[in-house]
Each structure stands twice: as C-alpha cells, then as structure tokens.
Amino acid sequence: MGVLKFKHIFFRSFVKSSGVSQIVFTFLLIPCCLTLNFRAPPIIPNVPFLWAWNAPSEFCLGKFNEPLDMSLFTLMGSPRINVTGQGVTIFYVDRLGYYPYIDLTTGVTVHGGIPQKVSLQDHLDKSKQDILFYMPVDNLGMAVIDWEEWRPTWARNWKPKDVYKNRSIELVQQQNVQLSLPQATDKAKQEFEKAGKDFMLETIKLGRSLRPNHLWGYYLFPDCYNHHYRKPGYNGSCFDVEIKRNDDLSWLWNESTALYPSIYLNTQQSVVVATLYVRNRVREAIRVSKIPDAKNPLPVFVYARLVFTDQVLKFLSREELVSTLGETVALGASGIVIWGSLSITRSMKSCLLLDTYMETILNPYIINVTLAAKMCSQVLCQEQGVCIRKDWNSSDYLHLNPDNFDIRLEKGGKFTVHGKPTVEDLEEFSEKFYCSCYTNLSCKEKADVKDTDAVDVCIADGVCIDASLKPPVETEGSPPIFYNTSSSTVSTTMFIVNILFLIISSVASL
C-alpha cells in the first residue's frame, strides 16, 4: 500500500519537473510514505496474538474435578478477591485504595462518593498496600483497573451516573452560596474533572512504579459508546463527539501501558449488528493506541465474554465468535482477554457445559484464527509485523481454508491440525491483508507469495502447521522481490536508487 502511494506521488512529480531537485525531493518523501502504520510488538516472543483467561475456572477443577483445557491461553487470572500473584490481575472498586463512589442501588456513599471529597494521599497509601498484596512478584502480566462507577469526562456521566454531577454541584453550592446555578455547574465540572483526572492518573503512575513489568490500563478505556444499535441505519460508527472526548483523555493514554476495551454482546444484537458494533469499538481502540506515539503504539487487549450479558448461561455461537474474536484479530489488536463470572463455573453442570463448549467451538476457533494470523504474518511480514485488513470495514477474516485444513480433537484430549495451505490460500491473504510492522523493526512485505517455500507455525505443543509448498517455476531475470516498509535498510535504498537510475537514464536518452 505504502509503495503504491509512493509510486503515484513520484511519477506525478516527475512528469511536472525533470529537474534533479524534484527527484531528490521525491526521494526524501519515501520514509514518510512507508512507515505510517505500526503495531505494538508482542509482549511475549513468538506470540503475536495473545490469549488471556480472566475467569474463575479453578472452581471446575477444585470443586467438581472437571479440568478445562487452558493450553491455548498464555496468561491466566481469576477475578476472585482472595487470589494473588496471577498473570491477569483485575482491580475492582473494593481492591485498590479508597475509590469514591455512590451505590446506585442503595444510595450509600462510599469514601466520600465523589473524587473531590477523598484524600488522594490516603488513597495512594492504601493502593500501595493492595498492589503489593495482589502482585507479590513483578512478573510479566496484565494489571487491569476496573472502575466503572463514574467517568472522568463530565459529559459522559449521563443517567443514572448524573448523580455524580448533582453531588458535585451541591458541593460547590455549599462552599459558594453566592454562585448562580450555571456558575456552580461550571465550577463543579472543573473541580470534578480535575479531581477525577488526578485520582486515576496518580493511581496508574503508582502501579507502574511499583510493578513496571505489568501492563497497566483501565478496563473499558477507550470506549466508543456506539450502543445505539436499535436505531435504523445503524453502522456501528462512533460519534464524532466521543472520538473528540477520547482525544481529550490523552493524559490517560500517555500513562497507560496497555488499553483494555470491551466487546461484550447481548442477545438483542444480531450477528450483523454485533459485527459492526465490535468492528468500530476495536478500530477506535487501535486509533487511540497511537495517540501517545504513532510510531510506538500501545498494545490493545480486548475484553470479550463467551456468554451474553443478558443471558449469562447462553454461549456465543461460532458465527458470533467470528463477529467478536475474528474481528479483533483481523483488525490487528494485540490480544483478547476472555472474562467470565462465577455463573459459568458455579456448578458441575455449568462446568461440563463450559468444557463441552471449549472442546467443540471455542478452542477449535482459537486454533483456526490464531494459526491463520500467524501464517499470514510469517508469509507476508517474515514474522516482523501483523496482517491487517486492507479494507477495515470488510468481512475479510484470517481463517484457515476449510477445504485444506482439519482441526481434530484426539483421544488424549489434545488438538491436532491436519492439512497444508495452497498458494491460492496465501494469495488470498495477500489480496485482502497487508503487513503492519512492529515498532522499531525492519519489516519486509513479500510481493509475491508464490515464492513461499514452506510454512512452519505453532501456537501450542503439537498444534502446528508445518508444510512444504511446491517451489514456484522461476523464469530467468525475475528473482523474488520484497518491498521494504522500513526506511532504514540498505535493500530499500538500493531498490529506490535503481528506479531513479532507470528513470534518469530514460530521460537522458530522449
């Protein structure tokens, strides 16, 4: 894509002026055209797409002796309050410092109710104790702060969260009786947003300083607020005002070391609606990941559920997994966190249902989409980037061709993959996806996948594709070509110099 853009720019410039200065100027444009789109590198080597598990699955083994196959998940953690030292640690309102909120069911005020009324220092002192308790060792892992009671952006506290606006206005009126309601509202907005910002910012700074090897971020940040799917003509897009509000949260993105958006579904969303809903939420998160530094974006780990929010015992179908997990992979996120509550592991029956679902639907699909993504990365990017849709709003997915592959569950309970890709399979990847380089890597995009000799990718022990492809018939004078999407390598320079030499020679002969 970048090479084609450069080609058009170059030849338009050359036709207008045959001067050397024009050619040199165009030459200098090359790096900016070839390095526009980066992705965060894998946090674990050779794991370009990370699967994490954040559900209390230990109940199935501990209480009911029903082990679940977790071999495909790299990081794991239970959301239960008494579990520590995990790969995924989630901090709810009662587990990290003194989070102020108002219980909307009972009306009870906790820790002052609003951020203006809590002692920030007392909160940070307690937070330090909590972080050291839940993370006794600073291993690589996820640190997810799940504070959903109020939002740091004043305008986003709509009903029923407008109680935080009302309390803030009341506080200002008590302290400044001479102010009119509009004046008190303006002052309340300023004080609330400043206190909320300081509260969230200092908390994540503390976490990063104490446990720097963990990936710190807030659950549901960023959010797209594209929940208007009952309206006619729904296309999933985020409202412009919400995109602007996400831009205004740059102070939060600058201190986060990962983003944790959510793509939970309910039964009111059809497969088509769910696809549009998820697609735009993930796309917005990836956009936000580049706000701190476009050349060094934050990793995006998307929270997903296996069940619906309004029917917690009804599992997503395979089509709905494509709409959620498949969308996330095709758009170039760093990974997915599967979250679950006690409802899916609270009884022997629910554990058996979960085990069956994982064996027959979830794990085969994870194997399918992850191997396809890894194969595409190996073929197109030489494993130095990820494959991303050329048309973000298309329904192109990274899937194995069912005509050429068979994923089987063997008698011992392990999965195996049988089959190998064809050149046509690889060409389809090349037609519909492009290579987005990892940060700070020299990333080559293969121009002709017919030159691929073999594919060798694995995602777990024995879950691999290891296949030799028939070598292409080479004609004299047409060696394999690579497009270099980094401006720092010798091969790129030589490629461009050769083009310039040929053009100048042609002009000189006229």
From Swiss-Prot:
Name of the protein in its database record: Hyaluronidase PH-20
Biological process (GO), any one: penetration of zona pellucida
UniProt EC number: 3.2.1.35
Keywords: Cell adhesion, Cell membrane, Disulfide bond, Glycoprotein, Glycosidase, GPI-anchor, Hydrolase, Lipoprotein, Membrane, Signal
Biological role: Involved in sperm-egg adhesion. Upon fertilization sperm must first penetrate a layer of cumulus cells that surrounds the egg before reaching the zona pellucida. The cumulus cells are embedded in a matrix containing hyaluronic acid which is formed prior to ovulation. This protein aids in penetrating the layer of cumulus cells by digesting hyaluronic acid.
Gene expressing this chain: SPAM1
Glycosylation sites: 82, 166, 235, 254, 368, 393, 440, 484
Annotated source species: Macaca fascicularis (Crab-eating macaque)
Lipid attachment, kind GPI-anchor amidated serine: 491
Recorded GO CC terms: inner acrosomal membrane; plasma membrane; side of membrane
Signal peptide start-end: 1-35
Tissue: Testis.
Annotated InterPro entries: Aldolase_TIM (IPR013785), Glycoside_hydrolase_SF (IPR017853), Hyaluronidase (IPR018155), Hyaluronidase_PH20/Hyal5 (IPR001439)
SUPFAM superfamilies: (Trans)glycosidases
Pfam families for this protein: Glyco_hydro_56
Active-site residues, as the UniProt record annotates them: 148 (proton donor)
Catalytic activity: Random hydrolysis of (1->4)-linkages between N-acetyl-beta-D-glucosamine and D-glucuronate residues in hyaluronate
Database matches in Gene3D superfamilies: Aldolase class I
Family: Belongs to the glycosyl hydrolase 56 family.
Propiece span(s): 492-510
Disulfide bonds: 60-351, 224-238, 376-387, 381-435, 437-464
Superkingdom to which the source organism belongs: Eukaryota
Gene Ontology MF term list: hyalurononglucosaminidase activity
Membrane topology qualifier: Lipid-anchor; GPI-anchor
Localization per record: Cell membrane
